[in-house]
Amino acid sequence: MSLIDQAKEQMAKTVENTKENFSGIRTGRANPALLNGITVDYYGAPTPIKAVASIGVPEPRTLSVTPFDASQAGAVEKALRNSDLGISPNRDGNVIRLTMPELTEDRRKEYVKLAKGKAEDGKVAVRNIRRKTKETIDKAVKDGEMGEDEGDRLLKDLDKVTKSVTDEIDTLLETKQKEIMEV
């Protein structure tokens, strides 16, 4: 695997990580990914909520959480209540409903700022991958393992890959901003 392919692979992982980070940012709509970081005390063991309940979106602003084990509905509700989502769960038998409140303009701007920060974190990670790969190429040229022309060609390829990945992160950010600001 060439150095450029390795860098591409690492950068692709960074883009996926950035997408994951974006999925945790609230928009005006219900999104099951909002519950990804929540763990339930399931018979004494902290367990991800996805492993103990099914999560659905019956309406655009409502999430429904149905525990697989009905006796654990209380534990799931407690985990949702104690989470940092800022949403109060409503229990209806074994089904727990989370209704997303309308976001205020100030809140939307905060979330846009948060999204920009996560996008910048992704870009910094991409630049770090580029820097490490560039150092490896420069060292190989200096040690005579490859010619200067090949080193220059690899650096140009690396710059193209880096630009396309940062553009992809910018596109993801634009999409997320539109989602957040949509009323």
Curated annotation (Swiss-Prot):
InterPro entries named among the record's database cross-references: Ribosome_recyc_fac (IPR002661), Ribosome_recyc_fac_dom (IPR023584), RRF_sf (IPR036191)
Compartments it resides in: Cytoplasm
Gene3D superfamilies, alphabetized: 3.30.1360.40, Ribosome-recycling factor
Single biological process term from Gene Ontology: translational termination
GO molecular function: ribosomal large subunit binding
The keyword Cytoplasm is assigned to this record: yes
Pfam family, one: RRF
Domain of life: Bacteria
Keywords: Cytoplasm, Protein biosynthesis
Similarity field: Belongs to the RRF family.
Alphabetized PANTHER family for the sequence: MITOCHONDRIAL RIBOSOME RECYCLING FACTOR PSEUDO 1, RIBOSOME RECYCLING FACTOR
Protein name, as recorded: Ribosome-recycling factor
